[in-house]
Amino acid sequence: MGTIQVDLGNRSYPIYIASAILDKIGTYLSEQPLGKKVLLVTDQQVAPLYAPRVIESLKNAGFKVAVAEIPAGEPSKTLEQASRLYDLAFDHALDRQSSVIALGGGVVGDLAGFVAATYMRGVPFIQIPTTLLAQVDSSVGGKVAVNHSRGKNMIGAFYQPQMVMIDVATLQTLPERELKAGLAEVIKYGVIWDGSFFTWLEKNYSRILNLDTTALEQVAETCCKIKASVVEQDEREQGCRAILNYGHTVGHAIESLSGYGTYLHGEAVAMGMISAARLALNEGILSQQDFERIYRLISAVGLPTELPRGLGPQDIIDSMYHDKKTVLGKLVFVLPRSLGQVDIFKDVKEADILAVLSQ
């Protein structure tokens, strides 16, 4: 088993990565200084697959478990769903020593984490991500949020989990579309941090799509190490952590304008990564060769490479101005200089963005 420690002082926590470790969650939690009441949050797709095993493991370890099932998908990231979870926590008399466990993908993790961060001003939070995207990205780093009609993740907090347990065996039941969407965030790490990892992905992406256990564990470990390194340097996104937003400026606009759930998060990020790479190419920052490698890999794994036809370029730009990543009314972009190196540009000209979105 691989173990990665996210070093944040008194908010440090371990990430456990292996295959077929879901049945051990009760044992792992017993080793933590936690109360014996748990709220397990999952969705209606994941629940029948994995909730019984997790519940049994927790009960065998002496935990009392309340279970909340939410509808699967981005539309569940709302204050209304959060309120329902608060009610359930009160109904089962959860106190400040009780824990909230997220069993599912990024939506479940974001919502459950938001509830954990705000219920009684914060209770322990455990992540058990079951999608590739959540395993390599959203379960690590402490960003928790719900959506608002004005934008994605606009109501949220930085709230670190107590522990992350990544069981790559859960990816065996992941729909192919979700697996490909998760690969967008995997590719992102190669572009922003590690060019050799990008090269490895070019040669091995088919192993990931074929659910090779060794490849899946390697991907999870590599991505989590990168994410941990960035978060340790800049937990609250005041500086270098913003590089993790590569592809997300345009991506979030696509999600918002299309209606949450039309495109998976990774699909929108893939389109955003290509848009940002094309902007870097046009600005003379990125070479034609590196742009083509980014484009080819995103295309090869089966992710969308062209912007949705129904969205106007100006509409996308207008939506980006409402994004929380804007600074003093200026659009902020993470642009690649080469594979493994990006920079943050805080005053990108609207005309240059419009030219890219119109191509």
UniProtKB/Swiss-Prot annotation:
Q: What is its main location?
A: cytoplasm
Query: What Gene Ontology cellular-component terms does the record carry?
Result: cytoplasm
UniProt-annotated binding residues for Zn(2+): 185, 248, 265
Give any single GO term for biological process. Answer: aromatic amino acid family biosynthetic process
User: Which superkingdom?
Assistant: Bacteria
**Keyword set, alphabetical order:** Amino-acid biosynthesis, Aromatic amino acid biosynthesis, Cobalt, Cytoplasm, Lyase, Metal-binding, NAD, Nucleotide-binding, Zinc
Instruction: Write the Enzyme Commission number(s) for this entry.
Output: 4.2.3.4
Enumerate the residues binding NAD(+): 106-110, 130-131, 143, 152, 170-173
Q: Which reaction does it catalyse?
A: 7-phospho-2-dehydro-3-deoxy-D-arabino-heptonate = 3-dehydroquinate + phosphate
Q: Which GO terms describe its molecular function?
A: 3-dehydroquinate synthase activity; metal ion binding; nucleotide binding
Instruction: Report whether tRNA-binding shows up as a keyword of the record.
Output: no
Family to which this protein belongs: Belongs to the sugar phosphate cyclases superfamily. Dehydroquinate synthase family.
Q: What name does the UniProt record give this protein?
A: 3-dehydroquinate synthase
Give the source species.
Desulforamulus reducens (strain ATCC BAA-1160 / DSM 100696 / MI-1) (Desulfotomaculum reducens)
